[in-house]
Amino acid sequence: MVAEAGSMPAASSVKKPFGLRSKMGKWCRHCFPWCRGSGKSNVGTSGDHDDSAMKTLRSKMGKWCRHCFPWCRGSSKSNVGTSGDHDDSAMKTLRSKMGKWCCHCFPCCRGSGKSKVGPWGDYDDSAFMEPRYHVRREDLDKLHRAAWWGKVPRKDLIVMLKDTDMNKKDKQKRTALHLASANGNSEVVKLLLDRRCQLNILDNKKRTALTKAVQCREDECALMLLEHGTDPNIPDEYGNTALHYAIYNEDKLMAKALLLYGADIESKNKHGLTPLLLGVHEQKQQVVKFLIKKKANLNALDRYGRTALILAVCCGSASIVSLLLEQNIDVSSQDLSGQTAREYAVSSHHNVICQLLSDYKEKQMLKVSSENSNPEQDLKLTSEEESQRLKGSENSQPEEMSQEPEINKGGDRKVEEEMKKHGSTHMGFPENLPNGATADNGDDGLIPPRKSRTPESQQFPDTENEQYHSDEQNDTQKQLSEEQNTGILQDEILIHEEKQIEVAENEF
């Protein structure tokens, strides 16, 4: 399929490679079983075709790659061995011309990263293909055979472990623990763990025994390895951890166990896929829901800047899109090409997903408008206005308080005038006068004015002040007259006593 530069076609809009067909004629039914040629070919309808291009490609490649051409195993005249190794220079040349492989013709090979085609679908799934080891008996020694097939009695296996190194590797860098874990021989795994073998040795794909056990769905062996302290976060050559393989296998129990033993839920592989993004890309709805409950990052980005929502839209999974929208995910985020999830949905003609995104956007708009017209905010505004009014009234009160001393001064002047009329300013007051007024205070014995702290609206009228001061003056005058009377009585008593003394002296 030849795509335009910078475009990102959806999975449902993949077209057949007519450009290559026109050169090769009709496709070989064995190599490309779903692609039967173009109607525009100059080849007849009988099925005959010019296969010179196919022969040339075969002669260069030798044996077909089983991942790219699973039904066509090459020519018996090839000088390539039976291991399946081949010269892939022609395949690389073909990739450079075609860009992205047609998913019908090449179901397992997704093209080259150097292609001019956009990043959609440019993921190599070969890491998840054929999880089990390819084992040949002649390549294994006694210990590795016993670990793989597990048919050796326990006593013989113990003797075997004493005589040989339990961490010995074969040609593919696999230990006995790798082989036993991948094939589910839990008794051998337990015996090796009891003998304290090394846990984190890597094979030729940089995978630990735990990674192989999870990849091959051998949960019992994987749990035993986790209990003995195997590191669950060691990535293989593709960047995948054990959790990535558990998510790919939709093994929720294994994923839960890995998280319980410290697996990183945000670890990324070489494509920038976290376990959540991998689950979305592979349309594993149940494990996606599981990871969302485990608080996986919904805004994580792959190497092309795509979120989980964009991946779900590109895959055409309406159920996962609906699941992500329930989490209030950001629908306006763009990838490195500047496209949003809605733009992908429109270009791929995913009408159901377009409707889901439109409904979600309308709900968000209504929510924002309701928040803007919130009555609580109106109450806050009214309370702020009232507080401003109160502040204004408080600012006016000091002016009223400043007028009080003038009023008090007027009342003091009236008191002084009344005192002058009665001549009280020239009298000496005793020390026990009310309000503590004395002649020594420098006020000529006058009563000091009382300062009122009440506002102007609460002060007494002028008539009441005059009555108060006149009553106070009458009391002082009464007190003075009483003191004068007592002085007269004391003088009379003294005079009477002097007369008695004189009478007594005359008698003597």
UniProtKB/Swiss-Prot annotation:
InterPro entries: Ankyrin_repeat_domain, Ankyrin_rpt, Ankyrin_rpt-contain_sf
UniProt entry keywords in alphabetical sequence: ANK repeat, Repeat
Ranges occupied by ANK repeats: 172-201, 205-234, 238-267, 271-300, 304-333
One protein family per Pfam: Ank_2
UniProt feature, compositional bias: Polar residues: 367-376, 476-488
Compositional bias of kind Basic and acidic residues: 377-392, 406-421
Region (Disordered): 367-488
Membrane-spanning parts: none
Nucleus keyword on record: no
Keyword Repeat tagged: yes
Family of the protein in this entry: Belongs to the POTE family.
Protein's UniProt name: POTE ankyrin domain family member G
Native species: Homo sapiens
The encoding gene: POTEG
